[in-house]
Amino acid sequence: MSLNFLDFEQPIAELEAKIDSLTAVSRQDEKLDINLDEEVQRLREKSVELTRKIFADLGAWQVAQLARHPQRPYTLDYIKHIFTDFDELAGDRAYADDKAIVGGIARLDGRPVMIIGHQKGRETKEKIRRNFGMPAPEGYRKALRLMEMAERFKMPIITFIDTPGAYPGVGAEERGQSEAIARNLREMSTLRVPIICTVIGEGGSGGALAIGVGDKVNMLQYSTYSVISPEGCASILWKSADKAPLAAEAMGIIAPRLKELKLIDTVIPEPLGSAHRNVPAMAESLKAQLLADLLDLDGLTEEELLNRRYQRLMNYGYC
């Protein structure tokens, strides 16, 4: 798979293009007197060093771009790499099956769990089918149906958050978008099973929170979590979306800042160059964190679990 490089990654892209060119020449003519292998290796080492340098000093806006990267792994990618025996469940039993939310029963190291997550698309048709990862009310009602099923069968709930926000269309509002989100917030706060939430890309406003109330809340290193997009904030405060980089810095949308504010528990490191550069390695790190979180929560009684979750919610806003 050829990589898509963002604007701030162009120096890396130029090096990678040189590497690809030399590699192609070497394959076409193995009788060349010049030892291209050594040059290719030198350029690869230089590319790694340059990538480390660039990614060591990323701003909030650059992280936001990475969180939206078109090749970034989505919920179904992590399900494929981390879980076994996934059986997808569909529909809210009231209106429709919202493809922007996927969910179902699977096994994590042999243990039954309920998985729920936002799902974006990659190709144009798939993006439209998934509504660009923006759920309607029926999506959140489907999620709640699966959570209640998990509680009934004593299965831990694992959610993956990756959405620009809940769908703001007229139809969604008419069908009770705000009510669906509010109901999820209320019900998730009292479910009597462990809930682990992980922001894997964009964590946009109430659309993210609707599956984001948990006993453990994690973020991938280059994911974001905010009440509004940087562009939306800039449009309100400065009347121009061009101020999005400034808004991103001011909003504190990145994982280290949110951990500092005690809004999340863990920042999960990503492979060099972000998650899409090495999906299996990213999935392995995420799996290890999920297992560690489950081990911690398994030691709590139902009452302790609920009390801890309640205190967590009440402490939001206090540093």
Curated annotation (Swiss-Prot):
Organism name: Pectobacterium carotovorum subsp. carotovorum (strain PC1)
Name the record gives this protein: Acetyl-coenzyme A carboxylase carboxyl transferase subunit alpha
InterPro entries: Acetyl_CoA_COase_a_su, ClpP/crotonase-like_dom_sf, COA_CT_C
Function: Component of the acetyl coenzyme A carboxylase (ACC) complex. First, biotin carboxylase catalyzes the carboxylation of biotin on its carrier protein (BCCP) and then the CO(2) group is transferred by the carboxyltransferase to acetyl-CoA to form malonyl-CoA.
Record note on quaternary structure: Acetyl-CoA carboxylase is a heterohexamer composed of biotin carboxyl carrier protein (AccB), biotin carboxylase (AccC) and two subunits each of ACCase subunit alpha (AccA) and ACCase subunit beta (AccD).
Pfam families per the UniProt record, alphabetical: ACCA
Localization terms from the record: Cytoplasm
Domain of life of the organism encoding this protein: Bacteria
EC numbers, comma separated: 2.1.3.15
Name of encoding gene: accA
Biological or metabolic pathway of the protein: Lipid metabolism; malonyl-CoA biosynthesis; malonyl-CoA from acetyl-CoA: step 1/1
Annotated catalysed reactions: N(6)-carboxybiotinyl-L-lysyl-[protein] + acetyl-CoA = N(6)-biotinyl-L-lysyl-[protein] + malonyl-CoA
GO molecular function, one term: carboxyl- or carbamoyltransferase activity
GO biological process per UniProt: fatty acid biosynthetic process; malonyl-CoA biosynthetic process
Top-level enzyme category: transferase
